[in-house]
Structure formats: C-alpha cells, structure tokens
Regions:
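Conserved ABC transporter NBD signature motif
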Residues: 72-80
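The feature captures the beta-strand-to-loop junction immediately N-terminal to the Walker
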Residues: 49-51
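ABC nucleotide-binding domain signature
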Residues: 47, 90-101, 115
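Helix-to-loop junction immediately C-terminal to a conserved catalytic motif
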Residues: 64
C-alpha cells in the first residue's frame, strides 16, 4: 500500500524525453538513456533500480544537473534547469539527492556516523556546527 504524503499534486521535478548519448568512437555513439519521461510530485519518494550499466547513475546525474543532456528537458519547480544560475543549482541540490549502489563506499570510515549525517546539513546552512 502506498501512502500519499502530499497535500496537493504539486509537480516538483519533471523530465521530458531525456536522452544521453556518449561518443565512443569517431562514428559511433552509445545511448545510455533514451527518451525518459518522469514526473515527481511533492511528498513522494522515488527509487531508481536496474541492472548494472543500464544508465541509472547517468539519469540521476542529469536530473541533478551534474551531467549535460543530449536532448530533452528537465524542470525543477517549473523552471528549466539548463537555464539555472549557480545559486539555483545549489538550491536544487539541497532537495535532490542520490545514494549510490554501494553507499558504504561513499562514507568516510574515519568519520563518526553523526558527522556523516550532519555534514550536508551544515554545508547547506540547515544546522550550525558546534
């Protein structure tokens, strides 16, 4: 059973016909993502799953404006992310996050768990460093 946490149907993130191709040689390209459409609404959580190498990380990097798209459009709160200023990119990344396939490899083993969890909050001025 899916519980609807939203108070309305506010569209937060939308991908339209999102495609990413990589040039692998002079005459060949590899299509990592092909015409993907996605609509995310306020209060919802989404997990992207698939086989290794199917384009999950590429797709998510495009959504976070970390990877240029080959074609298509991405809108965050109704605005085209390709036209975002640096401040708008920074703001959007406070709300769009990615957990890698092996999250254990992403953590610094020399940091305490509390420090790992609070670091992004401190970086985004959501928590004061004590």
């Amino acid at each position: 059973m899916v519980r609807d946490l939203s108070k309305n149907n506010e569209l937060i993130l939308e991908a339209r016909n999102l495609t990413k191709q990589f040039r692998v040689s002079k005459n060949n390209t590899l299509t990592a993502c092909d015409s993907i459409n996605l609509s995310m609404y306020k209060g919802k959580t989404l997990g992207i799953v698939g086989e290794s190498g199917c384009g999950k990380s590429t797709f998510l990097r495009m959504l976070m404006n970390l990877e240029p798209i080959s074609s298509g459009e991405i809108f965050y709160k109704g605005k085209d992310i390709s036209k975002f200023s640096k401040d708008e990119i920074w703001e959007s990344r406070q709300h769009i996050q990615m957990v890698y396939q092996d999250p254990g490899a992403s953590f610094n083993p020399r940091m305490k768990v509390v420090d790992i969890l609070t670091e992004p909050l401190i970086n985004y001025d959501r928590l004061k460093k004590e």
